[in-house]
């Protein structure tokens, strides 16, 4: 009987399952190499942890790893129901809150090694967490894509740790009770981007869609479609970073000015940025809450031992 020790949390409604023990040891020299090793040699562990019957499509996994940098607190590899994520803002907040819950860290600045580089997270005395994300930027502006059944849609392509297609003019109602229609619309948009060859820099696939609307209690409300056809319950840390990059490029948000990004569930992140050469360094602040401390069991005789 194999065992996996996990800590579950949610950040703005979006769950994170932090794997503390039980996965195979990884030997790569960088977090990117370790992610690739996990994907190529041990992917069944991701499936067992996140897919039914132990998980669900909404869960985002975070594998706690020893740091690869001398000044880092830890390393992390993020994954979901469909595969692996480059970076995850809400997951980083969940990671830091979980480590505090277990008594492994105290308030202060903690550096974290990820597959796309080192980020830092500040655990504040009041429990809020600010992630200094990877340098972010807008790659292309107002790119047209023909979405079958919906016509031509224009959006910006931006990097915030993942590749996003950001759309403000879409004609959709961004409300929680409209989530099924929004899911189908944004999934069709993702597929249209793929079939029409619209990509991020160097042909990188765009795997997130972000729609925006007005919100009475924030600067903006979003709906974020993630790979695997699950929408983000939080405002999305990497998506908010991509939004900040677009706002900075358009001259609509000054350096250091706060942007309040609401999600479709009403949760909020507070974002700001600092200039970093031709890119920006986003700072995303949010909170996470613990929901479970569990041991997952894998019985080799179970026909669904490694997920459905």
Curated annotation (Swiss-Prot):
Substrate binds at residues 89-90, 208, 232, 237-238. Gene3D superfamilies: Diaminopimelate Epimerase, Chain A, domain 1 (3.10.310.10). One of its GO terms (molecular function) is 4-hydroxyproline epimerase activity. The keyword Isomerase applies. The active site is at residues 88, 236. InterPro entries: Pro_racemase_fam (IPR008794). It catalyses: trans-4-hydroxy-L-proline = cis-4-hydroxy-D-proline. Its EC number is 5.1.1.8. It holds the Pfam family Pro_racemase. Belongs to the proline racemase family. Catalyzes the reversible epimerization of cis-4-hydroxy-D-proline (c4DHyp) to trans-4-hydroxy-L-proline (t4LHyp). May be involved in a degradation pathway that allows P.putida strain KT2440 to grow on either epimer of 4-hydroxyproline, c4DHyp and t4LHyp, as the sole carbon and nitrogen source. Does not exhibit measureable racemase activity in vitro with any of the 19 natural chiral amino acid enantiomers. PANTHER family: TRANS-3-HYDROXY-L-PROLINE DEHYDRATASE. This is 4-hydroxyproline 2-epimerase.
């Amino acid at each position: 009987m194999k065992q996996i020790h996990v800590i579950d949390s949610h950040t703005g409604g979006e769950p994170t399952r932090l794997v503390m023990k039980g996965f195979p040891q990884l030997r790569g020299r960088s977090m990117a190499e370790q992610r690739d090793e996990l994907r190529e040699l041990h992917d069944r562990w991701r499936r067992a942890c996140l897919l039914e019957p132990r998980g669900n499509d909404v869960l985002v996994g975070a594998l706690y790893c020893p740091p690869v940098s001398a000044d880092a607190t830890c390393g992390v590899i993020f994954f979901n129901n469909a595969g692996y994520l480059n970076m995850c803002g809400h997951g980083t907040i969940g990671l830091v809150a979980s480590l505090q819950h277990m008594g492994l860290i105290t308030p202060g600045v903690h550096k974290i090694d990820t597959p796309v580089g080192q980020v830092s997270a500040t655990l504040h005395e009041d429990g809020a967490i600010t992630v200094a994300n990877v340098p972010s930027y807008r790659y292309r502006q107002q790119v047209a894509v023909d979405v079958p059944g919906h016509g031509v849609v224009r959006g910006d392509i931006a990097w915030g740790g993942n590749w996003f297609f950001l759309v403000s003019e879409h004609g959709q109602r961004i409300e929680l009770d409209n989530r099924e229609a929004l899911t189908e619309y944004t999934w069709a948009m993702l597929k249209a981007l793929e079939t029409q060859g619209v990509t991020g820099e160097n042909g990188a696939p765009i795997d997130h869609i972000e729609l925006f609307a007005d919100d009475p209690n924030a600067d903006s409300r979003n709906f974020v479609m993630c790979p695997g056809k699950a929408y983000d319950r939080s405002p999305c840390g990497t998506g908010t970073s991509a939004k900040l990059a677009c706002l900075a490029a358009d001259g609509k948000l000054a350096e250091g000015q706060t942007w309040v990004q609401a999600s479709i569930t009403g949760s909020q992140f507070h974002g700001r940025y600092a200039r970093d050469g031709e890119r920006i360094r986003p700072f995303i602040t949010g909170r996470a809450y613990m929901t479970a401390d569990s041991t997952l069991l894998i019985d080799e005789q179970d026909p669904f031992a490694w997920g459905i």
